[in-house]
Curated annotation (Swiss-Prot):
Residues 1-230 are annotated as: Pyrophosphorylase. One of its GO terms (biological process) is lipid A biosynthetic process. Gene3D superfamilies: Hexapeptide repeat proteins, Spore Coat Polysaccharide Biosynthesis Protein SpsA, Chain A. Pathway: Nucleotide-sugar biosynthesis; UDP-N-acetyl-alpha-D-glucosamine biosynthesis; N-acetyl-alpha-D-glucosamine 1-phosphate from alpha-D-glucosamine 6-phosphate (route II): step 2/2; Nucleotide-sugar biosynthesis; UDP-N-acetyl-alpha-D-glucosamine biosynthesis; UDP-N-acetyl-alpha-D-glucosamine from N-acetyl-alpha-D-glucosamine 1-phosphate: step 1/1; Bacterial outer membrane biogenesis; LPS lipid A biosynthesis. This is Bifunctional protein GlmU. Catalyzes the last two sequential reactions in the de novo biosynthetic pathway for UDP-N-acetylglucosamine (UDP-GlcNAc). The C-terminal domain catalyzes the transfer of acetyl group from acetyl coenzyme A to glucosamine-1-phosphate (GlcN-1-P) to produce N-acetylglucosamine-1-phosphate (GlcNAc-1-P), which is converted into UDP-GlcNAc by the transfer of uridine 5-monophosphate (from uridine 5-triphosphate), a reaction catalyzed by the N-terminal domain. The lineage of its organism: Bacteria, Bacillati, Bacillota, Bacilli, Bacillales.
Amino acid sequence: MVKRYAVILAAGQGTRMKSKQYKVLHPVCGKPMVQHVVDQVLQLGIEKLITVVGFGAEQVKAQLGDQSEYAFQQEQLGTAHAVMQAAPYLQEKDGVTLVVCGDTPLITAETMQALLDHHLATNAKATILTAVADNPAGYGRIVRDAHGNVEKIVEHKDASEQERAIKEINTGTYCFDNKSLFEALTHVSNNNAQGEYYLTDVIEILKSNGSIISAYKAPSFEETIGVNDRVALAEAEKIMRERICRKHMMNGVTIIDPAHTYISAEVRIGRDTVIYPGTVIEGKTVIGEDCTIGPNSEIKDCWIGNGTTIRHSVAHDSEIGNDVTIGPFAHIRPSSKIDDEVRIGNFVEVKKSTFGKGSKASHLSYIGDAEVGVNVNLGCGSITVNYDGKNKHITKIEDGAFIGCNANLIAPVTVGKGAYVAAGSTITDDVPENALSIARARQVNKENYVDRLSIKKNS
């Protein structure tokens, strides 16, 4: 098998993005653009991957880690100059090299594999990934000879009227015979208006040497889109989102309105789960089977079991079990663990807390830094008072306890197994097992008191 290498061009500053963030690190469906490219390239059996970095190099390295080796482009002097930075790693090697831009997040492993196969089948020294564009203005045109081989690439500004009518364009992705690539790079000149070294000149050099230059058409233009500004970023996000939703639907997930459902690239969802509109599912969230999510819910980096319902709610960085009901308008904050058959109702906030199986907080409660046992009932308005102005403290509510409405549990405190806390109580001391704790003033009724007031209501 021919050895395969890849060079990803990720050194451009991306000034048109008008952003402090390095261009290729802008996310598309929750994943940086360059990570999308790397994930696809690594599916091709690549022996060595070189990412060319420049501005923002350390951020790119932090993102990709040991998935790639790195070449540094001190000055951005053109695409050929960028590829040349990979010479110390690759120039003496036999095989083929893919050159891919780090700002093309929609390119797929399938298309790059087809490009490789076509390159080898045609015995070419260079193969260009092309695409057919409805509006090719601004792109270099692919001019082919009678045999279908590439005769030349003509930039839009230099093209004749006949050449401008060509809709097949250069996408900036290539496959080269590796040694031929690096030999040709030594002959590239910057004798042009921009004073830069262009990778397209390699095509002309190889062609002039009598080498075969081939081209492979991508199945769609959208797959080759380069993201250079926020408009293109939004377009890439839209296309990627459609792909992701389609993949989940083909795997047995019902998405009521894909156009208004936002699922990140690394999310996993089980079959027969239903996703309603306005739902955002991000990070590395895993959702089981037979769940109902949404409408208008936000879930990030959660693990969710089977048969769970989350409506009009937010959940982050938490574990939620089977047959749980959350919402509407609940907030599950990070580091919470909700066991099976728990009910977290409307306007309940849970933060860094555990709920045992079958427990309920049905409405209007704050449960923070708490350990809630099995089959606990937290009445309306229950509050774990966890903060003393300096430190957070833990509340423990053991199995089978019953917390009445509008009860304040002042942490650190423990409510024992089967204990009851009367409605309206403020609990500052531990409650023993099976005890009833009442911590409120006794009701006093003053007969005819209103008649003795100096100021009476007007009738």
